[in-house]
Amino acid sequence: MSQRKARGPPAMPGVGHSQTQAKARLLPGADRKRSRLSRTRQDPWEERSWSNQRWSRATPGPRGTRAGGLALGRSEASPENAARERSRVRTLRQAFLALQAALPAVPPDTKLSKLDVLVLAASYIAHLTRTLGHELPGPAWPPFLRGLRYLHPLKKWPMRSRLYAGGLGYSDLDSTTASTPSQRTRDAEVGSQVPGEADALLSTTPLSPALGDK
């Protein structure tokens, strides 16, 4: 009896082996949990280091600083460019106003666009060229100016569509301001035959209806 008590209860077969297997099974799970915890603890540091690397890549190098310096230089020079552009526009506007003032019978308060001024100036130059007896050169003049007649601003304004289309053909409005080539030749023949009568007519006829009434 004493030997049996000292020895203790007999061990059941297979019980110790099952306990060791259970411990062996539990150990990998514990290792997995520990590895997960370690990963979660290390992840923020890894993310920070990765973000630091990404930030270091995104930071501009010497080229970026050079580009930034160029941008600053351009922004500093932009007021000078704006002032230069304003002076250019002012000079161009003054030139067009001077050209408009040189056109005959254009009131000073008449508002004409730049295209209007150019069309009227071209038509007036064509009229003067024909008056002097010179033919308009074909290749030197644009096609729409070859048949252009003198456009009177007071007759054409404010009909802008007729301002550009009236010079291409002979319209009723042009008949009062310009004469056909046959009429010009007839007038020249009459003037050469009776120069005294023509001078008398020019001296007696008033310049305008308003002056004639006076």
From Swiss-Prot:
Tissue expression as described in the entry: Expressed in liver, kidney and spleen.
Cellular compartments annotated: Nucleus
Chief localisation class: nucleus
Composition skew (Polar residues), residue ranges: 174-183
Description of how the protein assembles with itself and partners: Forms inactive heterodimeric complexes with TCF3.
InterPro entries associated with the record: bHLH_dom, E-box_TF_Regulators, HLH_DNA-bd_sf
Disordered: annotated segments: 1-86, 174-214
Gene Ontology biological process terms, A to Z: cell differentiation; decidualization; developmental process; muscle organ development; negative regulation of muscle cell differentiation; negative regulation of transcription by RNA polymerase II; positive regulation of gene expression; regulation of transcription by RNA polymerase II
MF terms (GO), sorted A to Z: DNA-binding transcription factor activity, RNA polymerase II-specific; protein dimerization activity; RNA polymerase II transcription regulatory region sequence-specific DNA binding; RNA polymerase II-specific DNA-binding transcription factor binding; transcription regulator inhibitor activity
Keywords of the record: Developmental protein, Differentiation, Myogenesis, Nucleus
Pfam family, any one: HLH
Functional description taken from the UniProt entry: Inhibits E-box-mediated binding and transactivation of bHLH factors. Inhibitory effect is similar to that of ID proteins. Inhibits the formation of TCF3 and MYOD1 homodimers and heterodimers. Lacks DNA binding activity. Seems to play a role in the inhibition of myogenesis.
Record's protein name: Transcription factor 23
Top-rank lineage group of the source organism: Eukaryota
